[in-house]
Amino acid sequence: MSRFHSLLAFVVASLTAVAHAGIGPVADLTITNAAVSPDGFSRQAVVVNGGTPGPLITGNMGDRFQLNVIDNLTNHTMVKSTSIHWHGFFQKGTNWADGPAFINQCPISSGHSFLYDFQVPDQAGTFWYHSHLSTQYCDGLRGPFVVYDPNDPAADLYDVDNDDTVITLVDWYHVAAKLGPAFPLGADATLINGKGRSPSTTTADLSVISVTPGKRYRFRLVSLSCDPNYTFSIDGHNMTIIETDSINTAPLVVDSIQIFAAQRYSFVLEANQAVDNYWIRANPNFGNVGFTGGINSAILRYDGAAAVEPTTTQTTSTAPLNEVNLHPLVTTAVPGSPVAGGVDLAINMAFNFNGTNFFINGTSFTPPTVPVLLQIISGAQNAQDLLPSGSVYSLPSNADIEISFPATAAAPGAPHPFHLHGHAFAVVRSAGSTVYNYDNPIFRDVVSTGTPAAGDNVTIRFRTDNPGPWFLHCHIDFHLEAGFAVVFAEDIPDVASANPVPQAWSDLCPTYDALDPSDQ
């Protein structure tokens, strides 16, 4: 009998461990509505496998990911269809699996499922996933995604890198996105690893991250934000950045990190302070700022410390992260020649806003009824033939492209973080800098486009080696919903042959188009 009880205890312990473990590379993601109260306030949300943020998805470089998304949404106050983007993955040959609704697919209808099936042959690092339909991810459909490299070149810099060292940042709202203002004046709460407090719920539980003295931890910081950027710090501790948006990075020691929506950093933290509790801080750039009552906070707890809230104080940051100091671990050639305009095609993105919608080069993005990928597969071969008119830019194959984003007071809400799908790009001019670096700039997939006050003209470069329509947009989701986006139709003649689509993908549009608008 004792052997049976031992076995039972082992099984229970194993199940408990699995409940907190990452899923993947083959997994079901069931999307439902549920009441959640991550900050002590209960509201209906969009959850993944029962929770928000959704479960950590993990795998190894070289894996084939087969992620079956099952849409069981029923709440009419939120979008009932869905579509999921796997943020940071190049999707080479699987443009149809990238996820943005009406760019790469029709949404998945409620009561239906869709299998995202893609290879990750040459990428590793920290990614995430989120709804790419309307503002649905703000209501909860967002989660972290890590691809491990068995031959990680930074492996000797840390001792621990597991599910428990992923740190997610979430802006949380008490009102569903479609019921609230078009441009909220700040989140109600900041959630760190799914827990937090609002100014009216200061007794809610906070996340605790445990460390063992003397160990070195690779923390993977992921901004799942819909809007604010955060200044992240841990009292009494420096952080050594080793990864930027899944790009291995030359080690850089900082004491605070400004992280914009959708960006990721890995940093090494050495647990070398006195055994105690230390505040983890993620201060948003607007809204409920500061730390009164434990808002915008979590707890770093050394093994052996009492289970109490920290009493540590924040010191002035003397080594904040500056993007110009980030460099790839392995120097990577910058596309084009090392002079201004030394590319095959340079495009300037002129921003504007009319009080309701954002514009790029005079056009506000409105989702087409037929996905751009389907338009191309169906025979449209020129940008002028692709909808939405004025928002699709044709890019030639195997060309060096430069994009500039001059900051302007005409587009309020800066700094706007811009994300390019299907690529990592070289940031040849960063926000806050007037220097053009063609030598060793960081590569990443989300960049702050800075502020007009700084006279910023953030400039990026990439090479067109990945046929397909790829979204370029502000990752403040409320701004994207207001049209702050364009589509790059890359190598149009080769899109169909390079991206064979499964029958299930072809079935998405007829199913979605048959829905009553109230069920979409």
Swiss-Prot record:
Q: Which Pfam families match?
A: Cu-oxidase, Cu-oxidase_2, Cu-oxidase_3
Cofactors (names)? Cu cation
Reactions catalysed, as given in the entry: 4 hydroquinone + O2 = 4 benzosemiquinone + 2 H2O
The answer on whether this UniProt entry bears the keyword Nucleotidyltransferase reads: no
- Xref: SUPFAM superfamilies: Cupredoxins
| UniProt binding sites for Cu cation 1 | 85, 419
The UniProt note on the cofactor reads as follows: Binds 4 Cu cations per monomer.
The record's EC number reads 1.10.3.2
| Compartment(s) where it occurs, according to its Swiss-Prot or TrEMBL record | Secreted
- UniProt keyword annotations, A-Z: Copper, Disulfide bond, Glycoprotein, Lignin degradation, Metal-binding, Oxidoreductase, Repeat, Secreted, Signal
In the UniProt record, which is one GO cellular component term?
A: extracellular region
Q: Which residues are glycosylated according to the annotation?
A: 72, 75, 229, 238, 354, 361
Does the keyword Disulfide bond belong to this entry?
yes
What sequence ranges are listed for the domain Plastocyanin-like? 23-148, 160-302, 369-491
Q: Which residues form the signal peptide?
A: 1-21
Q: Name one GO biological process term.
A: lignin catabolic process
Quote the record's binding site residues for Cu cation 3.
132, 421, 473
Detail which positions bind Cu cation 4: 416, 474, 479
Binding sites annotated in the UniProt record for Cu cation 2: 87, 130, 475
What GO MF annotations does this protein's record show?
A: copper ion binding; hydroquinone:oxygen oxidoreductase activity
Q: Which cysteines are joined by disulfide bonds?
A: 106-509, 138-226
Q: Into which family does the record put it?
A: Belongs to the multicopper oxidase family.
Q: How does it assemble?
A: Homodimer.
Q: What does this protein do?
A: Lignin degradation and detoxification of lignin-derived products.
What is this protein called in UniProt? Laccase-1
Q: Which organism is it from?
A: Trametes villosa
Show the taxonomic lineage.
Eukaryota, Fungi, Dikarya, Basidiomycota, Agaricomycotina
